[in-house]
Amino acid sequence: MWHYNIEDYDYRFHDDYTLQLYDNKRFVAELSFRLDGKALWITNLYRTEYGKTAENPDRHYGTEIFAILLIHLFRKGESFDSIIGRLSVQDADWNNWMTSIPYYAKFQQYVPDEVGYRLNFALFEDKAAMQQNQSVPLPAYKEKEAFRAFVAEFQQEHIRACKDAYFCYAVERIHP
């Protein structure tokens, strides 16, 4: 697990549900979300063009902004049982799922120590499968070639069917 001192980050809430991250006063990433009952919905997470090309290999803006949000919500005392996001078929067309699915699958290792959550990742064919808790069996992430081949096929199937996929983390509290 990583430790974040969020006071070291230049982040701002654009509104109640949009967090923006800056590096040297340059806008680098944005995360939009909503709290819906017992679920935290990630409605948008992206790096700006500058954030994608910034010459700082020690910074992982997508990871950092997601972690900052979790710390912020934890400090506010927000409680949720799951974190849900949609993987748009448009992003699959741009081949983005090849990086976003592995990123979400391994995000647990970047969850800050101070956040009392353990996140268990699951991937779903579509929203109906998610609502029925019918996740897609995933190869182990450490089997990189098998995982990459799985993601490539999963992405192509969704492009052919022109449908979105969903991911979800079951949130387990590990300390109050």
Residues covered by each model-derived region:
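Negatively charged, low-complexity tracts enriched in Asp/Glu with abundant Ser/Thr
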Residues: M1-H3, E7-D8
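Short linear interaction motif-like sites in intrinsically disordered regions of transcription factors
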Residues: H3, I42, N95-M98
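Terminal substrate-recognition subdomain of acyl/acetyltransferases
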Residues: D10-D36, F74-R75, S79-P176
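Conserved acetyl-CoA binding element of GNAT-fold acetyltransferases
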Residues: G37-E55, R86
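Generic marker of "main functional regions" within proteins
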Residues: Y50-K52, I71, E114
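Conserved acetyl-CoA-binding loop-helix of GNAT-fold acetyltransferases
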Residues: A54-L73
